Amino acid sequence: PKIKWTCNKARELAKEGKKTIIWSYFRNNIEHIGKYYLRDLNAVYIHGGIETGEVGIENTRKDNIKRFKDKDSDCMVLVANYASCAEGISLQHACHNAIYLDRSFQADLYLQSEDRICRLGNEDQKNIYILQSEIPRGVRNIELTIKNNLERKIDNMSKFLNDPDLKQMAIDESEGEMPIDENINMQDIKSMLDDLIKPR
């Protein structure tokens, strides 16, 4: 459901002429979305396995980023992980929409990823979507664990560096909707887990 929602949202934004960066920690997600699911939006993708290369050499980081940043390009989506698109890449003039399909525990790279489209002084409206799987009330999952740890780490970094702006720069998720689905119960979760660990 998260990948389907992500692709639908990217298409919706593209119809409005808006580019989107999709963040994922997982290489398979990055490749499948970039190669197959969003081919119609001429998506490009980068991760650690993609050569840095040069502009003009197809399927290199530099060329894919240039294609995405080009306002006249029909490339409407960049799919990436934090590490491959962390430092020195500025996207705020080309893109104002980010979707976090999933996240990792690395607070520094998470903040840098937000900074790709949210530069100080740039007043354009930004839309950042952080997706979490729907769960029954009272059940914890890895996405909530990551969310809580990121908040704690950002708070600690802010205190350690004596930089209250650091905490303000991070997206305040307390205003977002909690992904609670009252229709999912413990038996549904047990069935999903059984399917995942079933020998193939």
Regions found by a protein language model. Name each.
Residues 105-200:
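A conserved SF2-helicase RecA2
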Residues 25, 48, 103, 131-133:
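Cofactor-binding loop segments of dinucleotide-utilizing enzymes, especially the Rossmann-like FAD-
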Residues 38-41, 123:
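Short, well-ordered coil/turn elements that cap or connect secondary structure elements
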Residues 5-9, 32, 36, 63, ...:
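Alpha-helical elements of Rossmann-like donor-binding domains used by nucleotide-donor carbohydrate transfer enzymes
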Residues 21-23, 40-85:
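Conserved helicase ATPase core of P-loop NTP-dependent helicases/translocases
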Residues 1-39:
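Conserved helicase/translocase motor-coupling segment
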Residues 30-34, 62-65, 72, 76-102, ...:
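SF2 helicase motor core recognition
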